Amino acid sequence: MSNLPVIIGFGGINASGRTSSHHGYRRLVLDHLDTQSRLDTLTDLATLTNKATFYNGLFYLAGEAQGLTQTQLTAQLGDQVKDATLIRPIRTEAYDVEKLVLNKVAQIVPASGDYTCIRMRKRHLPNQLPDNWQVSQIDGDTVEVTISGAFTAILPDTKRAPVSAAGQLPDGFDPSSLYQSRNHPRNLQMTVFGASDALSSTGIAWQILQDHVAPDRIAVYASNSIGQLDEAGFGGLLKNPSTGKRITSKQMPLGYGQMPADFVNAYLLGSVGAVGSALGACATFLYNLRNAVEDIKSGRRDLVIVGGSDAPITPEVMEGFRTMGALAEDHELCALDGGNEADLRRTSRPFSTNCGFTMGEASQWIVLTSDTLALALGAQIHGAVAGVFVNADGHKKSISAPGIGNYVTLAKAAALTESILGAESLRHRSCVQAHGTSTPQNRITESHVINETAKAFGIKDWKVAAVKAYLGHSQGTAGGDQLAVSLGLWRYGILPGIASIDHVASDVHDSHLAIQAAHHEVGTEGIDTVLLNSKGFGGNNASAVLMGPHVANRLMVKKHGFKAMENMRSAQETHNQAANDYDLQSMRGLSNPTYKFGHNVLTGEDLLINRHQIVIPGYAKAIDLSVSNPFEDMC
């Protein structure tokens, strides 16, 4: 019997705010929401960014004694929190764009004579003295160095960064302050927050989820595309020796790209189930989603946590992408607009006249189960993932240039949609969440992929969205951003337009596409499927078929029957209320992420092992050792 992978929880954080309860999505369509939804999201941003606290029924601004109602709070802070989100100027908390470190190597020669004399602390002397140095003691801590002839020095220097905008997490939000972060890289701090948000959004305690399945039928598939490259991870590991700092014992292990999965297992779930971390550049999230979907469809797993977390807004990473010609530079934006000052809120312009992508950061997570487990739990159904297709590009010249693999993945995704729901649904009730990076190359190549697929399947005016216009490009987690926004479509009926553009570029292939700045008003059941599209450096292409909750429920009724689905409604209402309670606590700034350091650490002595099973303390079900012979016909 088939297994449908359904989404029972989702959460995270990016430039639009908290993901659960659709708050991040709401930020993109804020002016089109009902009053209460708009107030709730602005309130959530106010407390998330530490601009307000909640006490005894009222909100308080920092340093003020007068309590405010929710309406009063949002009236005062609404514009501030909107300005503190989405793509905007890089804040000094990340780094100072006016003082980007770029030290200079200089050859120093004596101004007169053959020698240069300098004084320094003795402990600052290099271990290996140059041959032309003579050192004499001045006092207990000071030495004089006489240098014969020229010597080389690295002089501290800075310059203004050519790129000064990014899709950062909301200003004032500090994930390290929410738990004992112990000098964790920013990426992993975001992981703890994002995965906790997703788990809490289910409205079901993890212990209950865990008790429904055997330990080995759980999995966590998560990673990022470039590892942890800030000071606390690989960034510090690589540059500390050359800047006079020591390498710490944490920088090496905490820099690995699979650490988001490791942290979730070790500090949130205590899971001993399957674990994996696929890497596929900008398609990384969908690669991990594919592993989860295939596991559930095949019956190998019942419950999978899928996620990604990328924090690439560091001076070195930004400069690396800039020198590739990939990022939108300030002077290029000025040239596009014919002005002297770059519009740092509109740096990302997918499918319009553009000059490069804008960096973003994000942590996105979903809780995926089989339809059978979701039914048994009475879980909320937010959507379903019918399949994820992955293909390479074939032979290349430049390793970073796009190739033909994306034609294969998107065509397969369209074909699967048609096979499940029919040609009419594909043609009239599907849309595409494009990779949409805002580079000149992407606007041509990806639009051609989507347009040719539309032609092949008889689709006219295929709606195309591109959330990087709002959020920037969060690298390996970008597919998670696309998925999270798509789930909001089925709650509020609005597919976000590409609001940063005022025209579609003349070289975009759009004869069969609908690309526009305005939002698409489609209704909560007007779209059956969203095709998520990702393209990554090196030839990493992935396309996923995401189906709406109304479609997932219809398929589940067909399999389990109407009565079984009706019987789960009571449990769904309970879990929905628990999720709403969590959302309310979060909006008030009263919830903290899960972080269980040193909790219930087991050793081999704690296990009960016999020929038939392994019993693990804390799990209601044992691991079954009745393994069938997969090569019976050969034995």
Label the model's feature ranges:
Residues 274-279:
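Short loop-beta-helix segment that forms the pyridoxal 5′-phosphate
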Residues 288:
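Active-site histidine-anchored catalytic micro-motif
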Residues 291:
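Active-site signature of alpha/beta-hydrolase-fold catalytic machinery across serine-
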Residues 1-226, 230-273, 294-297, 309, ...:
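Conserved "HGTGT" condensation-loop signature of ketosynthase/thiolase-family condensing enzymes
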Residues 302-305:
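Short acidic donor-binding loop at the edge of a beta-strand
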Residues 285:
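Short conserved active-site loop signatures built around small residues
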